[in-house]
Amino acid sequence: MEKQKKSINIYILSDSVGDTGDQVAHAAAAQFLDVEFNFARHPFIHTISLLDSILNKAVREDAMVFSTFVNPELNQYAADFCNQNTLKYLDVLTPAVNLFAEKTNLAPENKPGRTHSLNAKYFDKISAMEFAVTYDDGKDPAGFLKADIVLLGVSRTSKTPLSLYLANKGYKVANLPLVPQTQIPDEIWQVDSNKIFGLTTTKEVLNNIRRQRMIAYGLNPESSYSNMDSINKELQSADELFKKIGCLVINTANKSIEETATIIMESLV
């Protein structure tokens, strides 16, 4: 009989969106696989009365509390309340803000949502997301000439999710699936090879992914799509293309999207 996981509630409080606290809480919780965490984000808290109501609910649920208040009054109230009611509490933002204040000898703005200001970077990110969708899967070869990054790879090497992740970082990304016996668009040969990244994997990983995909669609997993010999030829053909282009090749087997994206971004510097 499977052992039931311990369940813990986590409240994320903010006078802005609460993304920062949410990311920190999830990152820390990921280190405890045997515990079931229930996350409840409470953004845009601007009054003591609303904060008090939420904190009292946290007491009833014996929740852990993460906060990213920039309003000193709200921040102090949350800290005092949690201390008095023995709630586990983490003020995520204040230590970092204080560190910057000490180093710069300047007072913080104490204005919530500064990281979400509608500035040029924000609009660049939106534009990059639209670009990634428009030029996904080699839909329009013209996109390769406009892109900051071009991803090439056989199917199931995470080209689309990687494109969207990089777009969220502000990069315009176009990707092309490498299909056997299909001609490579002329535009690829006109792109600076430093902007092109070849995505590969192991034949075992690709075989497993493709078999599971066929099963999910109710199809026979024993097909040319998932055949080991066919996969081996696909990967060899892709490797030969990468060598001709002279691009960086990344093996995505056992790598997260974030890890692959980091390698790409660092290579562009």
Curated annotation (Swiss-Prot):
It comes from the Bacteria. GO terms for molecular function: ADP binding; ATP binding; phosphotransferase activity, phosphate group as acceptor; protein serine/threonine kinase activity. InterPro entries: Kinase-pyrophosphorylase, PPDK_reg. It catalyses: N(tele)-phospho-L-histidyl/L-threonyl-[pyruvate, phosphate dikinase] + ADP = N(tele)-phospho-L-histidyl/O-phospho-L-threonyl-[pyruvate, phosphate dikinase] + AMP + H(+); N(tele)-phospho-L-histidyl/O-phospho-L-threonyl-[pyruvate, phosphate dikinase] + phosphate + H(+) = N(tele)-phospho-L-histidyl/L-threonyl-[pyruvate, phosphate dikinase] + diphosphate. It is an enzyme of class 2 (transferase). ADP binds at residues 153-160. Belongs to the pyruvate, phosphate/water dikinase regulatory protein family. PDRP subfamily. Bifunctional serine/threonine kinase and phosphorylase involved in the regulation of the pyruvate, phosphate dikinase (PPDK) by catalyzing its phosphorylation/dephosphorylation. This is Putative pyruvate, phosphate dikinase regulatory protein.
